[in-house]
Structure formats: C-alpha cells, structure tokens
C-alpha cells in the first residue's frame, strides 16, 4: 500500500548511488520485497539475484533456470545460505524433488552429492540466460571429490541467525595445490567454454 512512497524514495537515492560508480549494480531481491522493487530495478537497469531453490514465484518449489532474466546474476548459494552440498543433504525430500523436476532424473537422488551431480547442476547454471553466473568456491570444489572438503558442514560461511557463527570458512587448500589440480581446471574450463561464459 506504500509502494508509491517507497518507489519515490528509491528514485531519489538510488540514481545518485548508481551514477557514483562504474560498477554493475545487483540487488539482493530475495524473499519478501515490496511490489515496487522490480519497477525500480527495471527502470534503473539493476541486476536481480536468481537462486534456483529460492524462486521469486511463490507457487514454485524451484525456479526454472531457462526463465532467468538476462539482467540477472545467477548463483547456487551465497555467503548467508547453505552451500550446494549442504542444501542437498539437509532436506532429502526437497533434493529428490529437485533431482526429479529440475534435473529430470527418475531414480533415487544420491546422498551425499557426488561430483558428477555437482558438475551437472553447475553446468545448468552456467547455461542459463543470466548475464552473470557467480558461484562460491565451495560449489566449484564440490565437482571434484578429491579436492572438496570431506565435511560439507565446514563449508558454511555465515549463519545470519547465529551471532557466534560468522565468516568462518577458510579454504582448506593452498593456491599452489589448486593451481596444480589439472583435472579440476580442465573440467571447469570445458564447462565454461561449452556454455560460452
């Protein structure tokens, strides 16, 4: 009911902020947002954030990646959410629905998440129409069972509801080992090249 008010407030402030930088602006427009937010974002050409398991359409369990708007950033997880592997194992019923409805597989969803499945999910995100696909290091590493952390729970960066659990994640590999992981590098290069990212 206050959409016009918030729209006017946004249009007073946001254009100045956007004009102050050459950066591409992205909004974290997840969850309950006022109806005016998409109007403002469209008018100011602000990219939306698209997370498949947090769809903006309330009647959907999972967003359809092929319907992501071009003016968006797609990701699988963020610093405030469970990583891909954690999400997969937190709710087996939800994972099975994703496995069936989004990945179009009829058998039982494997647990814990194998590397081939992580690669499939990442490939689908890379292939979506979003302008940018930005994934966490943990989600990239999930594709390689030799490189990823054994304990998926240790990959969590931040739990907003827990003031004692904040920004804890530290990469368990040193950069030299990551650079030397040729199979991992070639796999990622192949996916990026095939999806023309």
List where the protein language model places each region.
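Catalytic cores of glycan-processing enzymes that make or break glycosidic bonds
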Residues: 1-197
């Amino acid at each position: 009911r206050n959409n016009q008010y918030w729209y006017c407030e946004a249009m007073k402030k946001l254009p100045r902020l956007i004009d102050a930088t050459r950066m591409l602006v992205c909004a974290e427009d997840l969850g309950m947002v006022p109806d005016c937010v998409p109007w403002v974002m469209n008018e100011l050409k602000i990219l939306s954030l698209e997370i498949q398991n947090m769809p903006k359409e309330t009647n959907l369990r999972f967003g359809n990646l092929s319907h992501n708007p071009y003016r968006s950033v797609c990701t699988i997880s963020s610093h405030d959410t469970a990583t891909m592997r954690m999400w997969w194992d937190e709710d087996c019923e939800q994972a099975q629905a994703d496995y069936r409805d989004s990945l179009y597989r009829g058998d039982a969803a494997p647990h814990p998440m194998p590397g081939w499945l992580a690669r499939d999910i990442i490939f689908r995100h890379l292939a979506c129409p979003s302008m940018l696909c930005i994934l966490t290091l943990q989600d990239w590493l999930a594709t390689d069972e030799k490189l990823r952390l054994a304990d998926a729970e240790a990959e969590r960066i931040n739990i907003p509801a827990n003031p004692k659990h904040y920004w804890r994640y530290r990469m368990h590999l040193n950069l030299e080992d990551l650079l030397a992981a040729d199979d991992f590098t070639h796999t990622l290069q192949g996916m990026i090249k095939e999806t023309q990212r």
